[in-house]
């Protein structure tokens, strides 16, 4: 299952809740720092976002994909940003989930989570980028963004599965990732 990543925390919780209503046996590829959330760590597959993934970490990812369970991913790997046109959208989706879907014969279900962070969050991201600061400073403000959403409702829309067999040689993995990204954002027009 692949989803956009508009909120950076609450969207993951909403994603897990939506899937958990149908299946309890799932795992979620997440930033390895989230393993510190003890109650949720059994559901998490760690991904090192600041360095290279060690061989042992890659083995854990492959072992998880080999199981007959849903794997939840945010293919962008980072929280959505405000683009020059004013739209809140994910950055480029990484192709690895397409390769894993092919290798482990897992269909991919597009999931759209609605929502956005504060203007301050997006302004920080924009200024950091303009100033050439590579460190993802806005990540440190995501817990605050989560608490700003107190008493709000997060809408999660689940699309139709795309068979792993559809990810053929007619497109390269990057193009298939873009295809899934487009299918995900098209779910905004579903309701």
Give the label of every model feature segment:
Residues 1-2, 110:
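Short catalytic-loop micro-motif centered on adjacent basic/acidic residues
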Residues 3-52:
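Catalytic core of membrane glycerolipid acyltransferases/transacylases, capturing the structured
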Residues 55, 59-191:
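Non-catalytic C-terminal accessory region of glycerolipid acyltransferases
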